[in-house]
Amino acid sequence: MEPDPSLSHSGSGNSHDFQWMVLPDGAFQSCGQTRTQLPAGAYSCAQDCYGRSQFHPQPLLADDYIDFPGSLPSRVLRDIALFWAARGRFERIGFLHRRGFLFYGKQGCGKSSLIHQIVQGVVAAGHVAFFCDHPYVFLAAMQEFRRVEPERPLVCVFEDIDATVKRFGDAALLQWLDGNHQVDRVVNLASTNYPERLDRRIVSRPRRFDRLLRIDAPDARFRDAYLARKLHGQPAAERARWVELTEGLPFAALAELVISVACLGNDLEESVALLKSLDAGAPSSLEFSDGPPPNQGDEPEANCDGSPVGCCR
């Protein structure tokens, strides 16, 4: 059925009046307040009981991550800005306008905080970001989003992508990363503690993830900036001592150290020693390097009818 031009809504922002929704059989049903665009922000994807896509605001958790000129978040945001501006060149050569970044490293080094900070920058530029929890629900939501907003730049986030693949398999993700759904103007951001658990089809094929970036424990400049922000009024010499003692501690341990010493009154050196012993005892990704290939003997979860978990039938 061809859309009726008289039903189109001009302008932008909210429509404060109820409107008529056109049903497939030509019938009409009232619908509530509408918008021509999603507000700039981060969203998770879901489905209602009828399988219709929904977008729920997603809180961002980047408050503690310190940014400064030349930092990784600022470099990635610069790359993304250059990528958005290059759309015409992609089209002239005949490529989908897509880009992918995979962040990897041991747990606690700040991958999620880094991604959330990048997303904050994307949102500040007026764009939208979508977090993928269930690949099949996510794919349906992205296709629905493009029906409403066909040209808007978007960022898609896949945190702990290895866990997503283990639970749901990689078929839907590979379709998305390959652009099989022809959803254009996309930047994909993913993270993993265990890159070796991911099939080489994901990590070793260009155009799925074009940049693989290792995230290590924060360096001295980052630690100094973080401690200066958290420990207001601390003498420079004392902060330098903290910076020296915390060499090699991951981001999460650095936050715990501030709580342990500044909030709970524990001894600095004893707290550092305890946190370093805990970090040394944490599972390393190297322990899994000789394990079975991803999904071997570990089938993705499914509903009783065989459809993937999270897929509304």
Residues covered by each model-derived region:
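C-terminal alpha-helical "lid" subdomain
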Residues: E2-G41, R205-P206, L212-R313
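AAA+ P-loop ATPase mechanoenzymes
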Residues: M1-R87, H97-R98, F103-G108, L114, ...
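Walker A/P-loop NTP-binding motif of AAA+ ATPase domains
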Residues: D67-A240
